[in-house]
């Protein structure tokens, strides 16, 4: 997995199909490339990295999410390199 986009850098990724929603209802998609970090924003622009722990359960930040793929906690069940929030 690509891990934290702050490490991979690059432009905001294109994405494939929507695969569900975060707990707050924002759509999550499987990203297909690297991303630029946009701290504190989740679903407030066309495509943004979800880097807001409040968008999950109020305790987990992006790094924890990427490390918890598939655990059934805050992470979605899908295995994805990067996860984005969209409007």
From Swiss-Prot:
<feature type="region of interest" description="Disordered">
    <location>
        <begin position="65"/>
        <end position="87"/>
    </location>
</feature>
<protein>
    <recommendedName>
        <fullName>Antibacterial substance A</fullName>
    </recommendedName>
</protein>
<keyword id="KW-0044">Antibiotic</keyword>
<keyword id="KW-0929">Antimicrobial</keyword>
<keyword id="KW-1015">Disulfide bond</keyword>
<feature type="disulfide bond">
    <location>
        <begin position="42"/>
        <end position="50"/>
    </location>
</feature>
<dbReference type="GO" id="GO:0042742">
    <property type="term" value="P:defense response to bacterium"/>
</dbReference>
């Amino acid at each position: 997995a690509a891990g934290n986009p702050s490490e991979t850098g690059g432009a905001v990724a294109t994405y494939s199909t929507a695969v569900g929603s975060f707990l707050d209802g924002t759509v999550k998609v499987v990203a297909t490339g690297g991303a630029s970090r946009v701290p504190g924003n989740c679903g407030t622009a066309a495509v943004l990295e979800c880097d807001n722990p409040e968008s999950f359960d109020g305790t987990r930040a992006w790094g924890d999410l990427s490390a918890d793929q598939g655990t059934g906690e805050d992470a979605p069940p899908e295995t994805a390199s990067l996860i984005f929030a969209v409007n």
